[in-house]
Amino acid sequence: MDDDQQFCLRWNNHQSTLISVFDTLLENETLVDCTLAAEGKFLKAHKVVLSACSPYFATLLQEQYDKHPIFILKDVKYQELRAMMDYMYRGEVNISQDQLAALLKAAESLQIKGLSDNRTGGGVAPKPESSGHHRGGKLSGAYTLEQTKRARLATGGAMDTSGDVSGSREGSSSPSRRRRKVRRRSMENDAHDNSNSSVLQAAASNQSILQQTGAGLAVSALVTTQLSSGPAAGTSSQASSTQQQQPLTSTNVTKKTESAKLTSSTAAPASGASASAAVQQAHLHQQQAQTTSDAINTENVQAQSQGGAQGVQGDDEDIDEGSAVGGPNSATGPNPASASASAVHAGVVVKQLASVVDKSSSNHKHKIKDNSVSSVGSEMVIEPKAEYDDDAHDENVEDLTLDEEDMTMEELDQTAGTSQGGEGSSQTYATWQHDRSQDELGLMAQDAQQRDPQDEAGQNEGGESRIRVRNWLMLADKSIIGKSSDEPSDKLTQSKKSLISDAKTTNKTSTPIRPKVSTTTTSTSTAAAAAAAATIAAKQAAAAIASSNINNNNSSLTQTVTQTVTRIGSIGRTTIACITPANNGNKSSSSNCNVDAASAAALAAAGVELDSIDDTMTEVIVKIENPESMPLNDDEDDAVCNEAIEDENTFDYDLKLGSPLSWTYDAVKIENEEFEDSYLMDNDDDDDDLLTTAAATQKHAKQSNEKQMAGSMVAGAGSGGAVKKIVLSAQQQQQLLEQQQHLQHLQLQPTSQSLQIKLPAIPATITTISAPKQMMSGAGTSGSLTPNNNCTLMSNKLGLPVKGQNLDLHWSHSDDNRYRVLVQNKRTRKESLEHSADMIYNADIEKPWVCRNCNRTYKWKNSLKCHLKNECGLPPRYFCSKMCGYATNVHSNLKRHLNTKCRDREKDADDEKKPGSASGNMPVVVGVGNGTAVPVSSSNNNNNGGGSSTSSTYTLVFQNDSA
């Protein structure tokens, strides 16, 4: 008997597979062998499909011997032709009611099976209006032009497929609607459908083509399968419709699990497998439910799952499978459940694509249908999505259709067999969907990381606020580097390092610098500026590279016992100077690189620390310890911290500098107001063309003279500590005279004009204090220190509620996270937070819009857009004629600078000369309320920029709130 035994291998998804393949071939225009033309437009098609779907085309094509004939359809509109093609290839088509009559007429003339009365399967009145069925009348939405003639009415096997229901679409009819066993959940389904209809419709509209392509084919196969199952299929479809769309086996096969089961026992096992697959998919969906792409599917699936659970009453088996699937579906909520359901209906091809299309129409129809369907007893009707009609109520099925569609379009080639339905397809879909979801989640996570790194960075260390300086760096100043190096270095964390290393450091010239660049030379409250200097110093180590010899050795800077301040570079107009610590540098040593004393920058001040320095570094991250964690005595720390902690101690500023070479020699001053206007000189590492002539020449002269410049920036402990000014050699002085813009040590020579820098989020201002060089060397330090003391770099451990001039702008997030609402000068402005990859939005800083390329910050997104368009990555084309170091790519910015900023500085310089002269040309810093320290710059002459006799220094001062 074993020899006589035969095994029947049944391909449950055979029809849907073939159909989906045709659809895919059509979409890709693969193996097309004929062309249909209407209204001057062409559609390529396959002779086999046309012949199978239309006796007219079959006869016509038999008479044609051309390899690729072209048929011009005279009285057919292109839109109708396309709809008929969709119908033939996908088994269904969505069309508005006003176009239905014309389509049916054209289909009649072309003898399209399923749309014309001449089909062997027996005809249903082509006009839905004529049909007495309630559904036909009620359907105002897209119609599924498949004749839903019940399998029984449909002359059953008479369909061209005759014996095999799967045989042809002409007999396409949704399983007889036993009428909804009444999807007990029809109301719920309706609700789901209603809620989902808009989304589904939108999705359907977008995917309608795809859906139509794959869904029609799948539907026809499914329908035939269902038809074969006959009334059972009808009941199952109704039950499935109650479960509704769990299977989303497009076309009436919704509950085809049952129909499939009824159709063949093999189908049942398949459906069982599908169910398991569906469950798996459901789990995947649960994971993926979060993805928006699945949202529509999720809604549908959820509805389906509910429908499945509730509507399953129709068929026990379906309920079992549906419930099993439905449970997961409901749990997952996304299409996977639907997919699983469709998989469950193994015999029935899950026509998810068709379902999707139907979804949009059937969602509406659902509402209508629930009423009409329940009342409709007649089996023959051209139903809107007739195959789904029952299912249509279950819009959920359509969700699966979407999924299936996606599969068909993208993966059909790879998994042609399973794309449409059946367990295989559902499994494939689930897997695909899962992957997609994970990808999306991953992307979202990445986005979040990109958006939030600042916050994280700021919060890494309990006691410190790390500031990534974006457009400004505290200017290191003649001021004492007073902070004990221990604290800064200790507090510094690697987190910034990682940030920096990730972001910008290519070679960490002195990786240790990062850890302890903060090496503060001496503790001094005034070191706030020093702190800035320290950060810069670390950079300068890099700058030292410019000087030339950075030895990546961590050895402390031993070249000079006295601290030297060297201009490392500038950010915007912010001049960055670095202090080369004296032997304190042992701590500095961690920072550093051996370089010329002048270039060597190992400075840790005020808890500011550079993560690393490298010749190729384009970004330096400055860490500022949180003043809260530090004693107020550490004014430097606090001062710096104030910047960081102004708003939560977690400011994250990106300080992007050109190569150390340019750091050292750029002579650009900073004006907070013009950050947006100024061009960051760091775009090119070493280009002299970016520097003023003086700066460029000084660049070379400085290297030779740096060593000669030894100024002791000895920080006297306490605010009263005396500061040694940098002593300039005669040669250096000569150079300064010749090169007005060069900073010797920390002092900016560019102009004697005082420069006031307002740091928006920081209770401090940076000003240029110009004093005679004589004063620099011999100036009583008390003058500079006292102001610092008064200003109290401490600034109350916490960022003061800075009420600086720039702080009049307040903003708050609106309920809609896509926008922010800003109120400035009693004016409200709403700004979209959507931005391109070149932009970073950081709500923690006053100027939240950051250029990802150069880290400049802007208050308004439009300003950043202009920057990206006109400035970013381009060398400046316009330079200030007054040699103040201002450079920009935008002519209007230069004009405004000359008319406002530069002129105002001259006036301020003139005004300050008098007070300054009274004080003996000693730099004086005056504490100003509102948490900002406004230094009074005593600029001696050189209003015209001829600062040959004077050198200017920048002091970063933080004022105590209490002050």
From Swiss-Prot:
It holds the Pfam family BTB. Residues 115-200, 228-340, 447-469, 482-520, 900-963 are annotated as: Disordered. A zinc finger (C2H2-type) spans 849-871, 878-901. InterPro entries: BTB/POZ_dom, Dros_DevTransReg, SKP1/BTB/POZ_sf, Znf_C2H2_sf, Znf_C2H2_type. Residues 162-175, 228-251, 263-293, 329-340, 937-953 have a biased composition (Low complexity). SMART domains: BTB. Changing A107V: In ORE120; defective in embryonic axon guidance. GO terms for cellular component: nucleoplasm; nucleus. It is found in: Nucleus. CDD domains: BTB_POZ_BAB-like (cd18315). Residues 32-97 form the BTB domain. One of its GO terms (molecular function) is zinc ion binding. Keywords: Developmental protein, Differentiation, DNA-binding, Metal-binding, Neurogenesis, Nucleus, Repeat, Transcription, Transcription regulation, Zinc, Zinc-finger. Residues 901-915 have a biased composition (Basic and acidic residues). GO terms for biological process: axon guidance; axon midline choice point recognition; axonogenesis; dendrite morphogenesis; gonad development; larval lymph gland hemopoiesis; larval somatic muscle development; nurse cell apoptotic process. The keyword ATP-binding does not apply. It comes from the Eukaryota. Residues 491-512, 954-963 have a biased composition (Polar residues). Putative transcription factor required for axon growth and guidance in the central and peripheral nervous systems. Repels CNS axons away from the midline by promoting the expression of the midline repellent sli and its receptor robo. This is Longitudinals lacking protein, isoforms J/P/Q/S/Z. It comes from Drosophila melanogaster.
